[in-house]
Amino acid sequence: MSAKMIERPNLLQNNKEYRVFLQEHSILFEYKMVCIQDLKGIYVIPSAQNSFLWFGVQFVRQGIYQGGVFRFTITLPPNFPDGGCPKVVFQTNVFHPLINPDSGELYLAWNFPEWKRTNRVWSLIQFITKILTKVDSKMTPINQVAAALLETDVEKFQKLAKESVKNSLSQVYDPPPTDDPHYITFSPYDNDLHDPIKEEIYQPKEERENKTVGFSWVQPGSLQPFSKSETR
């Protein structure tokens, strides 16, 4: 048996590990791209236990669903960045033409008929905000009832959409369904904990800039290290 044949299993193992490394790098790159985008009112983070699963929450600031706080997950395909489109599933029931009323899955084929390597996850996240901010009657629906009401009885559609908003708010403080430390959770406002943070945020910019940070051993007006006399 030749030396090359003996070494082949190790080579295959190394190739597999390298592919995993490249895949993890691709996922980290996608998340970095998400972080640098100016995405309004939507927050996502990969699971601490599974980088193919991302947790997200959308705060809707305008439109029919204004005021809603909708949780969702993004699941990347096993062979990402190749393969099909990532899957978005809402954890809150959302009455919407593009959201499956039974599974909560968002019908992404309307905007991403074919997922390519050049597609970015941040654009998918941006699409989530878009469909909750402005409902387009031209969308190819997955929820036929919602689509029909949008066309024939807008008032009733808006009423059911507002019920989705109300339900989402009633679940904001629910305990997490997983022990994953990256799952996004919220707690009620605590005056002792949050008031100092709020005051810091609303502090005038000039005061924050002039605030002393740390210690200095340099005498004002001098560039010589340790020129400042020690004070006790």
Regions found by a protein language model. Give the residues of each.
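Short amphipathic alpha-helices and their capping/turn residues within compact interaction modules
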Residues: 36, 75-81, 93, 129, ...
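Glycine-centered motif in EGF-like
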Residues: 91-151
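Alpha-helical recognition domains of nuclear gene-regulatory proteins
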Residues: 30-34, 75, 124-131, 148, ...
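Strand-helix-loop interaction patch of compact alpha/beta domains
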Residues: 1-102, 116-119, 123
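Charge-rich (especially acidic), low-complexity segments
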Residues: 2-12, 137-232
